[in-house]
Regions:
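Active-site anion-handling motifs in enzyme catalytic cores
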Residues: 1-165
Length: 165
Protein backbone atom coordinates (compact mmCIF):
# COMPACT_ATOMS: atom_id res chain seq x y z
CA UNK A 1 0.00 0.00 0.00
CA UNK A 2 1.39 3.38 -0.99
CA UNK A 3 -0.55 6.43 0.04
CA UNK A 4 -0.94 9.13 -2.56
CA UNK A 5 1.65 11.84 -2.47
CA UNK A 6 1.11 15.26 -3.94
CA UNK A 7 4.88 15.82 -3.93
CA UNK A 8 7.06 14.45 -6.72
CA UNK A 9 10.32 13.64 -5.06
CA UNK A 10 13.43 11.54 -5.40
CA UNK A 11 13.79 8.46 -3.16
CA UNK A 12 14.57 9.32 0.45
CA UNK A 13 15.19 8.06 3.94
CA UNK A 14 12.64 9.36 6.41
CA UNK A 15 14.07 9.91 9.89
CA UNK A 16 11.32 10.15 12.51
CA UNK A 17 12.41 10.62 16.11
CA UNK A 18 11.04 12.15 19.27
CA UNK A 19 14.23 11.45 21.25
CA UNK A 20 16.29 14.13 22.87
CA UNK A 21 18.81 16.27 21.05
CA UNK A 22 21.88 14.25 22.11
CA UNK A 23 20.49 10.93 20.88
CA UNK A 24 19.39 12.40 17.57
CA UNK A 25 22.82 13.96 17.12
CA UNK A 26 24.44 10.52 17.65
CA UNK A 27 22.13 9.07 14.99
CA UNK A 28 23.29 11.63 12.43
CA UNK A 29 26.42 9.57 11.63
CA UNK A 30 24.29 6.47 11.01
CA UNK A 31 21.95 8.46 8.78
CA UNK A 32 24.86 9.94 6.81
CA UNK A 33 26.34 6.49 6.28
CA UNK A 34 23.01 4.99 5.16
CA UNK A 35 22.32 7.95 2.85
CA UNK A 36 25.77 7.66 1.26
CA UNK A 37 25.60 3.88 0.97
CA UNK A 38 22.26 3.87 -0.86
CA UNK A 39 22.44 7.28 -2.60
CA UNK A 40 19.46 8.74 -0.77
CA UNK A 41 18.61 12.09 0.78
CA UNK A 42 17.23 12.26 4.30
CA UNK A 43 14.00 13.95 5.36
CA UNK A 44 13.86 14.73 9.08
CA UNK A 45 10.74 14.81 11.26
CA UNK A 46 12.00 15.73 14.72
CA UNK A 47 11.13 18.35 17.33
CA UNK A 48 14.44 20.13 16.63
CA UNK A 49 17.57 19.19 14.79
CA UNK A 50 21.25 20.09 14.94
CA UNK A 51 22.64 21.68 11.79
CA UNK A 52 23.10 19.10 9.08
CA UNK A 53 23.69 19.08 5.36
CA UNK A 54 22.34 15.70 4.35
CA UNK A 55 18.67 16.39 3.90
CA UNK A 56 15.55 18.38 4.53
CA UNK A 57 14.13 19.36 7.92
CA UNK A 58 10.33 19.08 7.76
CA UNK A 59 8.17 21.24 10.01
CA UNK A 60 4.43 21.35 10.65
CA UNK A 61 3.83 17.85 9.30
CA UNK A 62 0.17 16.96 9.78
CA UNK A 63 -1.30 13.44 9.98
CA UNK A 64 -1.92 13.05 6.23
CA UNK A 65 1.55 14.27 5.29
CA UNK A 66 3.10 12.11 8.02
CA UNK A 67 1.47 8.96 6.67
CA UNK A 68 2.35 9.93 3.11
CA UNK A 69 5.99 10.56 4.03
CA UNK A 70 6.28 7.15 5.68
CA UNK A 71 4.39 5.38 2.90
CA UNK A 72 6.51 6.92 0.15
CA UNK A 73 9.90 6.58 1.85
CA UNK A 74 12.51 4.24 0.47
CA UNK A 75 13.65 3.56 4.06
CA UNK A 76 12.27 4.73 7.41
CA UNK A 77 14.74 5.23 10.26
CA UNK A 78 13.11 5.73 13.63
CA UNK A 79 13.37 5.08 17.34
CA UNK A 80 9.62 5.33 17.81
CA UNK A 81 7.25 2.40 18.33
CA UNK A 82 4.68 4.08 16.09
CA UNK A 83 7.23 4.74 13.33
CA UNK A 84 8.26 1.08 13.55
CA UNK A 85 4.68 -0.26 13.59
CA UNK A 86 3.56 1.94 10.68
CA UNK A 87 6.57 0.93 8.60
CA UNK A 88 5.78 -2.74 9.19
CA UNK A 89 2.06 -2.32 8.48
CA UNK A 90 2.73 -0.32 5.29
CA UNK A 91 5.48 -2.69 4.13
CA UNK A 92 8.22 -0.05 4.11
CA UNK A 93 11.83 -1.08 4.78
CA UNK A 94 12.94 0.39 8.10
CA UNK A 95 15.65 0.53 10.72
CA UNK A 96 15.25 1.19 14.42
CA UNK A 97 18.09 3.43 15.60
CA UNK A 98 18.76 2.93 19.28
CA UNK A 99 21.52 2.02 21.66
CA UNK A 100 21.85 -1.62 22.73
CA UNK A 101 20.92 -0.91 26.36
CA UNK A 102 17.57 0.70 25.50
CA UNK A 103 14.69 -1.49 26.69
CA UNK A 104 11.59 -0.31 24.84
CA UNK A 105 9.53 -3.46 25.30
CA UNK A 106 6.81 -2.54 22.80
CA UNK A 107 9.30 -2.13 19.97
CA UNK A 108 11.45 -5.06 20.99
CA UNK A 109 8.41 -7.33 21.36
CA UNK A 110 6.95 -6.63 17.92
CA UNK A 111 10.38 -6.95 16.29
CA UNK A 112 11.00 -10.26 18.05
CA UNK A 113 7.55 -11.68 17.24
CA UNK A 114 8.06 -10.84 13.55
CA UNK A 115 11.72 -11.97 13.43
CA UNK A 116 12.85 -8.44 12.60
CA UNK A 117 15.39 -7.89 15.37
CA UNK A 118 18.15 -7.49 12.78
CA UNK A 119 16.52 -4.17 11.82
CA UNK A 120 17.98 -2.54 14.95
CA UNK A 121 21.08 -0.43 14.34
CA UNK A 122 23.01 0.46 17.48
CA UNK A 123 26.19 1.86 15.94
CA UNK A 124 27.55 3.35 12.77
CA UNK A 125 29.75 0.27 12.25
CA UNK A 126 26.65 -1.91 11.76
CA UNK A 127 25.78 -0.01 8.56
CA UNK A 128 28.86 -1.57 6.92
CA UNK A 129 27.22 -5.01 7.19
CA UNK A 130 24.02 -3.97 5.41
CA UNK A 131 24.00 -5.30 1.88
CA UNK A 132 20.36 -4.78 0.94
CA UNK A 133 17.85 -2.72 2.91
CA UNK A 134 14.77 -4.37 1.39
CA UNK A 135 12.55 -6.65 3.48
CA UNK A 136 10.53 -9.59 2.20
CA UNK A 137 7.21 -8.76 3.84
CA UNK A 138 5.35 -11.90 2.64
CA UNK A 139 6.21 -14.06 5.66
CA UNK A 140 6.11 -11.07 7.98
CA UNK A 141 2.57 -10.21 6.89
CA UNK A 142 1.43 -13.77 7.65
CA UNK A 143 2.87 -13.50 11.17
CA UNK A 144 1.45 -10.00 11.57
CA UNK A 145 -2.03 -11.14 10.53
CA UNK A 146 -1.89 -13.96 13.11
CA UNK A 147 -0.86 -11.47 15.81
CA UNK A 148 -3.68 -9.14 14.81
CA UNK A 149 -6.22 -11.99 14.88
CA UNK A 150 -5.00 -13.05 18.32
CA UNK A 151 -5.25 -9.48 19.61
CA UNK A 152 -8.72 -9.07 18.15
CA UNK A 153 -9.89 -12.32 19.77
CA UNK A 154 -8.43 -11.24 23.11
CA UNK A 155 -10.23 -7.89 22.94
CA UNK A 156 -13.53 -9.49 21.93
CA UNK A 157 -13.32 -11.91 24.86
CA UNK A 158 -12.37 -9.13 27.26
CA UNK A 159 -15.27 -6.95 26.10
CA UNK A 160 -17.78 -9.79 26.36
CA UNK A 161 -16.66 -10.61 29.90
CA UNK A 162 -16.93 -6.96 30.88
CA UNK A 163 -20.41 -6.65 29.34
CA UNK A 164 -21.79 -9.61 31.35
CA UNK A 165 -20.80 -8.22 34.74
Amino acid sequence: LRLKSNMKTEPYILYYSLDGFDQRKRNLDVLKKLADKFGLKVKFITPEWPCHKIGEDLRDVGPDDFLSLISNAEIVCTNSFHGTALSIKLGIPFYVLEEKNVKDERKRSILKQLDLEERIISSCDEVENIIDYHINFNGINIKLNKLMESSSLYLKKALCIGAEE
